[in-house]
Amino acid sequence: MKKVIITGGNSGIGYQTAKQLAEKGWSVTLFCRRKEATEQACEKIRQQTENPHVDYFLVDLSDMKSVRQAVEQYIQKEETLDVLINNAADFDLSIKSPVITKDRLEKQFATNVVAPYLLSSLLKGLLEQSEKIGRAHV
């Protein structure tokens, strides 16, 4: 069974991607920050696709400690990863002044640039492992 992580998969394009891959029999893991919305999205995908292999980890992509913890939890649970889809984004035009994170990064930059880079770096080993057995392309 192929495995995918999708950030921001509880709504929009991420949700539709998760649903389509679940329909194809993939094991889908969502990395999202809102627990209730993510639980509802997972349950809805499971029901609509009859695929029980839809799960999630809570992660705040603007917090690099949270990103690292989510990856550690995933690695403890799974031995392989075929695809990482960095879908989540922070794009709020109503914010007039920068929001600085605990990591001393501007929040949108942390979420949209640093977190995808960190996720890709931390999960590279699993992706390469899948590549060796012909399941992923890194």
Regions found by a protein language model. Give the residues of each.
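Ankyrin-repeat alpha-helix packing hotspot
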Residues: V113-V114
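Conserved small/polar residues in nucleotide/adenosyl-binding loops
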Residues: I133-V138
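Conserved glycine-rich Rossmann-like NAD(P)H-binding loop of the short-chain dehydrogenase/reductase
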Residues: K24-Q40
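Conserved NAD(P)H cofactor-binding loop of Rossmann-fold oxidoreductase domains
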Residues: N87-L93
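Conserved hydrophobic beta-strands of the Rossmann-like cofactor-binding core
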Residues: K3-I6, L84-I85
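The beta1-alpha1 cofactor-binding region of Rossmann-like NAD(H)/NADP(H)-dependent oxidoreductases
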Residues: K35, F57-Q69
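Short alpha-helical oligomerization interface
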Residues: S94-A110
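Conserved glycine-rich cofactor-binding loop
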Residues: G8-G12
